[in-house]
A protein has these predicted regions:
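Membrane-interface helix/loop caps of multi-pass membrane proteins
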Residues: 1-237
Length: 237
């Protein structure tokens, strides 16, 4: 039970690959499926955050206040800097109408609801979307909303034994996957932006974090390197 989710070079490598794929997709450099990098990010975030919460609660030292303070310190300073930089640049080059729209998007970004605002105003895959300098903050909105939901669910799961907690988390993940699959077919625009349709990826990562807690041998360095190599091949394919 003393296994913790520490720094992982393999995860950093997958994160770097995910960023590269998204960048190549947006620059139109022959990677039409590069947006899968977003999915990789969500699973990694679920694994790191979900695993941390689960382990901290089992060890008896989880603190709601400390959890959110750490999230704020990690995300908000860089996010504010990006928003200010974008605002300053766009002040000189955008039209008054576009600048007003940027103000709305910036406020939504800082309030962790940029995915909802963009869902209501833009088609992610349309050429015009590329002109929105805060377009990519939608995924951060999804992650931040997950930070509000995950602790409550995972803290409930720690009240049950290992087998039942795994079963419940697996059931939640499968239910969210079914919702996402149905949404992708029926309302793909909403399924791209909104957290209920993205939750299964984050919960799948959290499930892996729980597995890491109870089965650390399955996450040895050799096993991790093998799984990372397989992951890279699957993403590249």
């Amino acid at each position: 039970m003393n296994s913790t989710v520490k720094y992982r070079a393999d995860i950093d490598g997958l994160r770097a690959l995910a960023v590269l794929l998204v960048v190549l997709f947006h620059f139109g450099l022959g990677f039409p499926g590069g947006f899968v990098g977003v999915d990789v990010f969500f699973v990694i975030s679920g694994y790191l955050i979900g695993g941390h919460i689960y382990q901290s609660k089992l060890a008896g030292h989880f603190s709601w206040g400390q959890f959110y303070v750490r999230r704020i310190k990690r995300i908000l300073p860089a996010l504010i800097a990006v928003v200010i930089a974008v605002w300053l640049v766009m002040f000189f080059i955008s039209t008054p109408a576009d600048f007003r729209k940027l103000g709305r998007d910036a406020a939504a970004t800082l309030l962790s609801v940029s995915n909802v605002t963009l869902w209501n105003s833009i088609d992610y895959f349309s050429p015009s979307a590329e002109h929105n300098p805060l377009l990519m903050t939608w995924s951060l909105g999804v992650e931040e909303q997950f930070y509000f939901l995950a602790p409550l669910l995972i803290l409930v799961l720690t009240r049950f034994d290992k087998k039942l907690s795994f079963l419940l988390m697996g059931s939640v993940t499968l239910l969210c996957f079914a919702i996402a699959a149905a949404g992708t077919l029926q309302i793909p625009h909403s399924a791209w932006f909104l957290t209920p349709f993205r939750a299964w990826e984050l919960f799948a990562g959290a499930l892996l974090g729980m597995a890491h807690t109870h089965f650390p041998a399955a996450f040895s360095a050799k096993a991790d390197n093998l799984k990372s190599a397989v992951g890279v091949l699957l993403i590249a394919g």
